[in-house]
UniProtKB/Swiss-Prot annotation:
Enzyme Commission code: 3.6.1.-
CC terms in the record's Gene Ontology section: cytoplasm
Protein name per its UniProtKB record: RNA pyrophosphohydrolase
Organism taxonomic ancestry: Bacteria, Pseudomonadati, Pseudomonadota, Gammaproteobacteria, Vibrionales
Pfam families named in the record: NUDIX
Root EC class: hydrolase
Length: 172
């Protein structure tokens, strides 16, 4: 679905593990990495699209994850002019995304990128929470930064933190 402004309605998916790391996927046959994402079909809610894309791209189902949060607003990015398909109608100039923060609830061995009819990814790894903001293709950076900033306080509790501070050396 493309809205009246030329943006394709889309979902973005951030999957966290219990160590505060996020799932980072390598695009099929390319050297670029990104979060799973995909278009919203006619008649589909953002949440339905997210679960469909999660299965098609990562091989996970609703029972394999817990939805922690959804972005408050739609986040948009424009495609570079060289990537716009000017000959297709309606013309899509970018993506308008609803983002989801998920926590992995199953063993990571269930991740299977070969479930969809044409795989989007051919590799994946866990990375530190803020790593994707620095590493994603430049035209997506602002959207990634905004989504990750919104989810940060919710994602960080998954991480096992070391307690910082002075050690109590008082012996009474």
């Amino acid at each position: 679905m493309i809205d009246g402004d030329g943006y394709r309605l889309n979902v973005g998916i951030v999957i966290c593990n219990n160590h505060g790391q996020v799932f980072w996927a390598k695009r099929y046959g390319q050297h670029s990495w990104q979060f799973p994402q995909g278009g919203i079909d006619d008649g589909e809610s953002p949440e339905q699209a997210m679960f469909r894309e999660l299965y098609e791209e990562v091989g996970l189902t609703k029972k394999d994850v817990k939805v922690i949060a959804t972005s408050r607003h739609w986040l948009r990015y424009k495609l570079p002019k060289r990537l716009v398909r000017w000959d297709s109608q309606p013309v899509c100039i970018g993506q308008k995304q609803k983002w989801f923060l998920l926590r992995l609830e199953c063993d990571e061995s269930k991740i299977n990128m070969q479930r969809g009819s044409s795989p989007e990814f051919d590799g994946w790894r866990w990375v530190s929470y803020w790593y994707p903001v620095r590493q994603v293709v430049s035209f997506k950076r602002d959207v990634y930064r905004r989504a990750m900033k919104e989810f940060a306080s919710l994602a960080m509790p998954f991480k096992e933190r070391k307690v910082k501070g002075k050690r109590n050396t008082h012996r009474g």
